[in-house]
């Protein structure tokens, strides 16, 4: 608890710098000061989805039963929905600023993603990453229906991967192209992360110890 606030701030900063150093640097001539926030929004959206999926998985294994209720999943759904909207807002803000500035070294990013078949991929990203989850998660009932909510969490993981593909692939390929490595690379990294996560999870208490606010958090009723 002592380091949670500091860790959150450091996580936001390192996430933004990772976006600049790993993704934006693929095209050395293109730059966007808002790109770090764009990456941050997508990352925190996925944190909410993974948190919900892990909680569902643990409850299926007989753990956390009676502790995590549908009200908690509804709150995670609110955060997931909020970051879906925030991601779209930041994405549109970046596009609007580049369109308004109309500088060749900036517009090249979107020009590459509107030519040679990439325009279709851009439309799929807009519809699949924003419009569909916005409609699916806007209602209260959708966040309390665990089958639908779990499906949407998995769906957003896939769309987040597609967002990465949309950022990286046009720099490497003039025309739309997909390799088996685009999928297996993600699966490999996901496997390493899952193994490390489960290793840490097995050695720590699932429920915070001696937390004076724990009872209030577990017994609240959502609206």
What are these regions (language model features)?
Residues 63, 67-71, 189-223:
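Extramembrane terminal tails and long inter-domain/linker segments of multi-pass membrane proteins
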Residues 108-124, 171-188, 212-223:
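Membrane-interface segments at transmembrane helix junctions and kinks
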Residues 147-158:
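Central hydrophobic cores of alpha-helical transmembrane segments
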Residues 89, 133, 164, 205:
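Hydrophobic, well-ordered secondary-structure elements that form the walls
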Residues 1-123:
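Long, contiguous internal "core" modules enriched in hydrophobic/ aromatic residues
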Residues 26-31, 142-146, 167-181:
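Extracellular/periplasmic helix-loop-helix junctions in multi-pass membrane proteins
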Residues 41-56, 128-133, 185-201:
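Hydrophobic cores of alpha-helical transmembrane segments in multi-pass inner/ER membrane proteins
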């Amino acid at each position: 608890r002592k380091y949670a606030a500091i860790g959150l701030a450091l996580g936001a900063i390192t996430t933004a710098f990772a976006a600049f150093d790993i993704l934006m640097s693929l095209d050395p001539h293109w730059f966007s000061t808002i790109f770090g926030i764009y990456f941050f929004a997508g990352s925190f959206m996925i944190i909410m989805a993974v948190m919900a999926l892990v909680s569902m998985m643990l409850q299926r294994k007989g753990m956390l039963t009676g502790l995590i209720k549908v009200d908690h999943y509804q709150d995670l759904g609110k955060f997931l929905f909020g970051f879906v909207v925030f991601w779209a807002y930041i994405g549109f803000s970046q596009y609007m600023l580049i369109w308004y500035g109309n500088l060749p070294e900036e517009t090249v990013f979107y020009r590459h993603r509107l030519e040679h078949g990439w325009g279709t991929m851009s439309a799929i990203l807009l519809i699949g990453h924003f419009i569909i989850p916005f409609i699916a998660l806007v209602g209260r009932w959708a966040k309390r229906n665990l089958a639908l909510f779990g499906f949407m969490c998995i769906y957003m993981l896939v769309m987040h991967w597609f967002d990465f593909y949309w950022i990286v692939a046009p720099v490497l390929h003039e025309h739309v192209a997909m390799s088996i490595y685009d999928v297996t690379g993600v699966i490999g990294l996901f496997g390493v992360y899952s193994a490390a996560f489960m290793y840490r999870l097995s050695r720590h208490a699932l429920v915070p110890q001696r937390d004076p606010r724990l009872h209030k958090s577990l017994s609240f009723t959502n609206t």
